[in-house]
UniProtKB/Swiss-Prot annotation:
It comes from Rattus norvegicus. InterPro entries: Cystine-knot_cytokine, Glyco_hormone. It comes from the Eukaryota. Heterodimer. The active hormones thyrotropin, lutropin and follitropin are heterodimers composed of CGA, a common alpha chain described here and a unique beta chain which confers their biological specificity to the hormones: TSHB for thyrotropin, LHB for lutropin and FSHB for follitropin. Its main location: secreted. Residues 1-24 form the signal peptide. Disulfide bonds join 35-59, 38-88, 56-110, 60-112, 87-115. Glycans are attached at residues 80, 106. This is Glycoprotein hormones alpha chain. One of its GO terms (biological process) is luteinizing hormone secretion. Shared alpha chain of the active heterodimeric glycoprotein hormones thyrotropin/thyroid stimulating hormone/TSH, lutropin/luteinizing hormone/LH and follitropin/follicle stimulating hormone/FSH. These hormones bind specific receptors on target cells that in turn activate downstream signaling pathways. One of its GO terms (cellular component) is extracellular space.
Length: 120
């Protein structure tokens, strides 16, 4: 009987340690570690004192869903899952002139939208 009490005590101590560790972690930091949300950030290269230039930077997440039967029939190599990536892009922007004559987009609002330009 004494043996069961020891096992129960060890299990309770280990459970409380695990719960303590989980409770002390910040919410969601393990999920998106090292990748901030999509938002405006100042571009240090183009910004000058009194006239900051902003760019949209950060992460957006892709989604996956079952491939519709109609689409599967037209695929050369049919796949069961279709994925759609989203990128952090400017929702609105203004044109700005920097470094004398270079025209750049100064982003004013960001959102996650369909990716049009993919890196190869």
């Amino acid at each position: 009987m004494d043996c069961y009490r020891r096992y129960a005590a060890v299990i309770l101590v280990m459970l409380s340690m695990v719960l303590h560790i989980l409770h002390s972690l910040p919410d969601g930091d393990l999920i998106i570690q090292g990748c901030p949300e999509c938002k405006l950030k100042e571009n240090k290269y183009f910004s000058k004192l009194g006239a900051p230039i902003y760019q949209c930077m950060g992460c957006c997440f892709s989604r996956a869903y079952p491939t519709p039967a109609r689409s599967k029939k037209t695929m050369l190599v049919p796949k069961n899952i279709t994925s759609e990536a989203t990128c952090c892009v400017a929702k609105s922007f203004t044109k700005a002139t920097v470094m004398g004559n270079a025209r750049v987009e100064n982003h004013t609002d960001c959102h996650c939208s369909t990716c049009y330009y993919h890196k190869s």
